[in-house]
Swiss-Prot record:
Superkingdom of the organism of origin: Eukaryota
Cofactor stoichiometry and binding remark: Binds 1 Mg(2+) ion per subunit.
Enzyme Commission numbers on file: 6.3.4.4
Protein name: Adenylosuccinate synthetase
Classification of source organism: Eukaryota, Fungi, Dikarya, Basidiomycota, Agaricomycotina
Sequence positions that bind IMP: D13, E14, G15, K16, N38, A39, G40, H41, T133, R147, N224, T239, R303
Substrates-to-products reaction catalysed: IMP + L-aspartate + GTP = N(6)-(1,2-dicarboxyethyl)-AMP + GDP + phosphate + 2 H(+)
Active-site residue numbers: D13 (proton acceptor), H41 (proton donor)
Organism listed in the record: Coprinopsis cinerea (strain Okayama-7 / 130 / ATCC MYA-4618 / FGSC 9003) (Inky cap fungus)
Length: 428
């Protein structure tokens, strides 16, 4: 049995959660392999006949299916107070997660001091700040890389945990000065949290391989997106983990040969949050239209997202690394009101077309985007559920993307509702 994967193909916020929610109806395990509570999305589902909105940040959104088990793998970093706050919020809305949510004993822990340090680092960087969510994700991964981080299993060795915790905090004091922090109070708080956490902790490698060996269907929900990957994104304006297909293997302990269908989620235009080059960004009426009609505000931070045309130079780079088998094109309805739609197909620098995506951001900031202009459809598509019923120009836009990327689009999002998703057959 192989693992299916859903990955963000741009700079995040593509709408991965909605597809995961739909696919979760046919899966047994939904796993996360990277990131922390720095990502976020909202899913609207009917519970007992009433539509309810659930906000996910850290927990796998497949939990909306009551028959699905959620797993946070070893590649995830976990802030326990946020974990329990999110879990309590979901359960208070009627989503029972009893005996169907598990955490890897190898996962790294995020502490409040990581969040404080995250803010201090941004202040230190000043005008060069990356624009993090200040959730402590970067400092936690930094501790992991320097082998000073604490993992979930350390919580169950109280004396060892306390000694390691004091040492790590003291190291942060030496680096950033003595900021206000109750070290002993935190040790006591985590002693109590450890007991509450104990029933959720498993050896995630054994867990997922046992599930696969028994024929269970596993779906991996990627966090963030390819252009935020620590290696392949617009470094340093990236997150601190591997958000590419490679992170699926390292973040869950599964071999590449077990990775099956890989689905890329791509927004019909482009957005990003925070600083960094954005070649197709539209600082004009088009950008305002995309932002307002698309409700482009972050679930985690509430920040306005920067908006621009679809960038196929980004997508070609993304395809090379993740090897998508299919796409879910999302928020296509946001383009309904536009007379014409531009698509960036390549970059030129100093008059020469580039053959690959630049690693050097100084070069990326100077590129000229080569656009193709397509006609708009000027017709609302939110109520359409059959591909054949889409306007002709809308189908031309979809076909153009497929032809350029040589990957089929199997799902098309045409609105925020759970049912606002068109399934496209290969012969259409």
């Amino acid at each position: 049995m192989s693992v299916s994967v859903v990955l963000g193909s741009q700079w995040g916020d593509e709408g991965k959660g909605k597809l995961v929610d739909i696919l979760a109806g046919d899966i047994d395990v939904c796993a996360r392999c990277a990131g922390g509570n720095n990502a976020g999305h909202t899913i609207v589902v009917p519970i007992d006949g009433v539509e309810k909105s659930f906000a996910f940040h850290l927990l796998p959104s497949g939990l909306v299916n009551p028959k699905c088990t959620g797993l946070l793998g070893n590649g995830v970093v976990i802030h326990l107070p946020s974990f329990f706050a999110e879990l309590d919020a979901l359960e208070s809305q009627g989503l029972d997660c009893t005996n169907r949510l598990f955490i890897s004993d190898r996962a790294q822990l995020v502490f409040d001091f990581h969040q404080i340090v995250d803010g201090l680092k941004e202040v230190e960087l000043g005008g060069s700040s990356i624009g993090t969510t200040k959730k402590g994700i970067g400092p936690a991964y930094s501790g992991k890389a320097s082998r000073s981080g604490l993992r979930v299993h350390h919580l169950f060795e109280p004396e060892t945990f306390a000694a390691k915790f004091r040492k790590v905090v003291e190291g942060r004091f030496k680096r950033y000065g003595h900021f206000e922090y109750d070290t002993e109070g935190e040790i006591e708080r985590y002693r109590k949290l450890a007991e509450r956490l104990r029933p959720y902790v498993v050896d995630s490698v054994a867990f997922i391989h046992k599930a696969l060996a028994s024929g269970k269907r596993v779906l991996v929900e990627g966090a963030n997106a390819l252009m935020l990957d620590i290696d392949f994104g617009t470094y340093p304006f990236v997150t601190s983990s591997s958000t590419s297909i490679g992170g699926v293997c390292t973040g869950l302990g599964i071999p590449p040969k077990m990775v099956g269908k890989t689905i890329g989620v791509v927004k019909a235009y482009t957005t990003r949050v925070g600083a960094g080059p954005f070649p197709t960004e539209q600082l004009n009426d088009v950008g305002v239209h995309l932002q307002e009609v698309g409700h482009e505000y972050g679930t985690t931070t509430g920040r306005r997202r920067r908006c621009g045309w679809l960038d196929l130079a980004v997508m070609k780079h993304s395809c090379l690394i993740n090897g998508y088998d299919a796409f879910n094109l999302t928020k296509l309805d946001v383009l309904d009101g536009l007379d014409e739609i531009k698509v960036g197909v390549s970059y030129s620098l100093d008059g020469k077309e580039l053959s690959s995506f630049p690693a050097d951001l100084e070069l990326l900031s100077r590129v000229e985007v080569n656009y193709v202009t397509l006609p708009g459809w000027k017709t609302p598509i939110t109520e359409i559920r059959n591909y054949d019923d889409l306007p002709a120009n809308c189908k031309k836009y979809i076909n153009f993307i497929e032809e350029q990327l040589k990957v089929p689009i199997e799902w098309i999002g045409v609105g925020p509702g759970r049912d606002a998703m068109i399934t496209k057959r290969k012969d259409q």
